[in-house]
């Protein structure tokens, strides 16, 4: 094998759509072994070995910003071709069916009324406010790594062992900053495809989806770029798949 090819660093496009601390994520993925380009250029996004989708703030605002740069189409095109995508924080939440937020004071939804925003629908589920006395859920927390046993119980093929958390101790903690999450996973039972591998965490009275592995599509509710050595290892695991 040509040594220049074998030593090539994977090229990651970090989608710049106005949401998220892109520089922090860029530096972390570079430390994980990839070359990172912050971009919204469609050709660059499609050409890259991997696409990183960050996101912070309100679900509705992130979806609006994503649509403004046709980011939803770019993500969909990559997934249709089996090309790797990693979503972080709200970048994970927008992959679900919808998000619900509650208006405060006056606004389109009215005081205290629920406002629904359609997501990308890659996974079934609704992003809702966590049930906890202290919000946001800010700080370090452990993750309950899934093993595919729920799929086996439904007569479906068990998911393969986690690649995302390979080499990471169960006691490791990751850094979360959020008030909303997906608290129910509606597992598909058609038996035709291997189900995603779902990982969970808890805060207050809520148990929520902390991360998902679904073929080329990975996502985390926590911030691996802010999660020390454990987060760096997770990013290295993703880069190794590119």
UniProtKB/Swiss-Prot annotation:
Any one Gene Ontology cellular component term annotated for this protein: cytoplasm
EC number(s) per entry: 4.3.2.10, 3.5.1.2
Keyword Phosphoprotein: no
Single annotated GO MF: lyase activity
CDD domains with a match to the protein in the record: GATase1_IGP_Synthase
Main location: cytoplasm
Catalysed reaction, written as an equation: 5-[(5-phospho-1-deoxy-D-ribulos-1-ylimino)methylamino]-1-(5-phospho-beta-D-ribosyl)imidazole-4-carboxamide + L-glutamine = D-erythro-1-(imidazol-4-yl)glycerol 3-phosphate + 5-amino-1-(5-phospho-beta-D-ribosyl)imidazole-4-carboxamide + L-glutamate + H(+); L-glutamine + H2O = L-glutamate + NH4(+)
Compartment(s): Cytoplasm
InterPro entries in alphabetical order: Class_I_gatase-like, GATASE, Imidazole-glycPsynth_HisH
Active site: 89 (nucleophile), 223, 225
Domain Glutamine amidotransferase type-1: from-to ranges: 11-242
Keywords: Amino-acid biosynthesis, Cytoplasm, Glutamine amidotransferase, Histidine biosynthesis, Hydrolase, Lyase
Biological process (GO), any one: L-histidine biosynthetic process
Pathway: Amino-acid biosynthesis; L-histidine biosynthesis; L-histidine from 5-phospho-alpha-D-ribose 1-diphosphate: step 5/9
Domain of life per record: Bacteria
Subunit structure comment from the entry: Heterodimer of HisH and HisF.
Its job: IGPS catalyzes the conversion of PRFAR and glutamine to IGP, AICAR and glutamate. The HisH subunit catalyzes the hydrolysis of glutamine to glutamate and ammonia as part of the synthesis of IGP and AICAR. The resulting ammonia molecule is channeled to the active site of HisF.
Protein's name according to its UniProt entry: Imidazole glycerol phosphate synthase subunit HisH
Gene: hisH
